[in-house]
Amino acid sequence: MQFNTDKPIQKSTEDLLGRKSFSKMLAEAVDKYKGTDSLVIGLFGKWGVGKTSIINMVLENLNDQIIVHFSPWNYSSHSDLINLFFIELSQSILDSGNARNKHTLKKAFLKYKRAIKVVSNKPIVKGMISALIQFVLGVHLEFLWSSPSLEETRDQLKKELGKINRKIIVVIDDIDRLTNEQIKDIFQLVKQVANFPNVIYLLSMDREIVCRALHEVQQ
């Protein structure tokens, strides 16, 4: 008797369902992207269809990029989520050994993190949640708020990130397994930091569950 687990595969040689061609094409598209503007890539599918396996094969086929795995499972507040994200993002970049501007980059991260936490602690209005739903549906939206302090620190961080000559791939998997509030927080976070240069977000989720969760949070 043979038992099969639902654990995702780790590399292309383990693929028995013909997903490696798609994974390779997606990886090539990321590698060939020469722009510095950030990208958000959504990988949609029901639970168990192999989204994590595809992500693993995509990462396997990427050429020398900085990979950031962000798992937003344990946090107590939105400001805590921001803190965890920037710790993970900054540490992954600094540990890669590719950032020659380590000192100024670390300083820029700290300043921006403090500024964005101040803004994020303001009450969330319903219009913003509606915008998050539109974001999931693929509608381009402008940044929903600004302040001089936030603008200044963001511009400095963008300048430092622009000096890195590799793409930064931020992977957030299983978004649909989070609570409704956590799902809202994740998309709010992505909207806040989605315009950084050289950063590509790969988001994996069940689109129907996520859209329903955001609608329910809006009520």
Where are these regions (language model features)?
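Extended, composition-driven regions rather than compact fold-specific motifs
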Residues: M1-K11, L16, E88-L89, Q134, ...
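Glycine-rich, phosphate-binding/catalytic loops in enzymes
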Residues: E60, F86-I87, I186-L189, Q219
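Conserved Walker B catalytic segment
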Residues: S149-R212, E216-V217
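Switch/connector loops and helix/strand junctions flanking conserved nucleotide-binding motifs
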Residues: K51-T52, S77-D80, I209-L214
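P-loop NTPase nucleotide-binding core
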Residues: I55, E60-K163
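A short helix-turn-beta junction within AAA+ P-loop NTPase domains corresponding to the substrate/partner-engaging
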Residues: Q65, Q218-Q219
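Walker A/P-loop-proximal flanking segment of P-loop NTPase domains
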Residues: M1-Y75, N83, V193
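Conserved structured core elements
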Residues: L16, K20, K24, D37, ...
